[in-house]
């Protein structure tokens, strides 16, 4: 806050340096040298106050980022402990046990559930297919399976327009084209 004198450099510095405007200009010229003076307060305020707080702040952030990104956690998470350790341990101990349990109950489940399932769908399916084939033959007629549109012939646009014109003149009503 004592550097506020730098903001009004003209009253204090030309006063003691009162050698005239030239000396004031020399001080103003030295603010070219005073350019270091603003950096000195800026360095005073900036470097000790701003940069060290930002420095340590960025350093803790950097340190927090560096362990996060750099080394221990990601390397630990993505590296040996997580894929190697966790999945390895899970896959080895629980997955092995699950595989053992999966094999033993899975086989038990597949045999009791699989055999009735395989027997019921295939057996009943075959029986149902036979029944459905008999029912279909009894329900549907062979004439129904034929194509009803097979005997149709193509019609030209002129014929259609003549039919519509005839119906309009014949009926006189727009709603009865198909009557």
Curated annotation (Swiss-Prot):
A cellular component term from Gene Ontology for this protein is: nucleus
Primary subcellular site in the record, as a coarse category: nucleus
Q: Where is the composition biased (Low complexity)?
A: 60-71, 79-109
PTM Asymmetric dimethylarginine: at which residues?
Answer: 37, 59, 68, 77
Q: Which UniProt keywords apply?
A: Cell cycle, Cell division, Cytoplasm, Cytoskeleton, Disease variant, Methylation, Mitosis, Nucleus, Phosphoprotein
Gene Ontology BP annotations:
cell division
Q: Where in the cell is it found?
A: Nucleus; Cytoplasm; Cytoplasm, Cytoskeleton, Microtubule organizing center, Centrosome
Q: PTM Phosphothreonine: list the residues.
A: 51, 120
Positions of post-translational Phosphoserine modification: 40, 47, 72, 80, 82, 93, 104, 115, 124, 133
Indicate, by first and last residue, each region the UniProt record lists as having compositional bias (Polar residues).
110-122
Record annotation: effect of changing residue 104 to A: Has no effect on interaction with PLK1 in mitosis. Partially prevents phosphorylation
Q: Which residues carry this modification: Omega-N-methylarginine?
A: 57, 117
Where are the residues of the annotated region Disordered?
Answer: 1-135
Is Metal-binding tagged as a keyword?
A: no
The known PTMs are summarized as: Phosphorylated during mitosis in the cell cycle probably by CDK1.
| Tissue specificity | Expressed at highest levels in liver and kidney; intermediate expression in skeletal muscle, pancreas, heart and placenta; low expression in brain and lung. Expressed in epidermis and hair follicles.
Q: What InterPro entries does the annotation carry?
A: MPLKIP-like_vertebrate (IPR026618), TTDN1/SICKLE (IPR028265)
* Subunit structure, as described in the record: Interacts with PLK1; phosphorylation-dependent.
Known role:
May play a role in maintenance of cell cycle integrity by regulating mitosis or cytokinesis.
The illness linked here is: Trichothiodystrophy 4, non-photosensitive: A form of trichothiodystrophy, an autosomal recessive disease characterized by sulfur-deficient brittle hair and multisystem variable abnormalities. The spectrum of clinical features varies from mild disease with only hair involvement to severe disease with cutaneous, neurologic and profound developmental defects. Ichthyosis, intellectual and developmental disabilities, decreased fertility, abnormal characteristics at birth, ocular abnormalities, short stature, and infections are common manifestations.
- The name on file for this protein is M-phase-specific PLK1-interacting protein
Report which gene this protein is encoded by: MPLKIP
